[in-house]
Design a protein with these regions (language model features):
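Catalytic core of membrane glycerolipid acyltransferases/transacylases, capturing the structured
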Residues: 1-61
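Non-catalytic C-terminal accessory region of glycerolipid acyltransferases
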Residues: 61-178
Length: 178
């Protein structure tokens, strides 16, 4: 698979460092300044090599997003799946996801329009604390669209699928403790 990621991570050292320090470590992960500084300084050096080898597709919040869609389509044409983290993590990462961004739905719509393909969307939940990954049943963009759902509604349906996976993990862990 090829992941989507913040375009800042494909920028120069200063751009990567600022994103890691201010946004990723402090805003999203809630790390203290020293830990954020140390990690941002080290990882801003290493990340270009990691992301180049991962073939990270940079995502944007503006018109350049069409570039992300075109690049994604070329990988899909080659049979390579795209990994999207659609949760809104602007306030940090929570176990129960409050909001999904619509990018994954926009991608599904783009592929549908340009290739007439209903790409499967698999909801996935990873619990770092419980060290478990749960993969749900595939969702069909066309089916949801044909039912009259908007992009925002489809994103929310997918979010609820992912949160259900989290609930499954919790229930399974409770049963294991008994």
């Amino acid at each position: 698979f090829v992941p989507w990621g913040a375009h800042e991570m494909r920028g120069n050292y200063k751009t990567r460092w600022k994103y890691l320090y201010y946004v990723f470590y402090q805003q999203k992960l809630k790390y203290k300044k020293f830990k954020s500084f140390f990690l941002a300084t080290v990882l801003a050096i290493i990340n270009p090599f990691l992301y180049k080898n991962m073939r990270l597709i940079p995502t944007y919040q503006d018109i350049r997003f069409t570039k992300s869609l075109r690049e994604s389509l070329s990988y899909l044409d080659d049979g390579i799946p795209i990994l999207v983290f659609p949760e809104d993590s602007s306030e940090g990462y929570d176990e129960i996801i409050v909001k999904f961004n619509e990018g994954v739905v926009v991608l599904a719509d783009y592929v549908d329009k340009h290739r007439d393909i209903d790409i499967p969307i698999y909801p996935v939940y990873y619990s770092k604390r419980k060290r478990v990954i749960e993969i749900g049943k595939k969702a069909s963009y066309r089916t949801l669209k044909d039912k009259g759902h908007t992009r925002a509604e489809i994103a929310d349906i997918l979010r609820r699928h992912v949160n259900k996976l989290y609930e499954n993990i919790k229930l399974r862990k409770l049963k294991e403790k008994r």
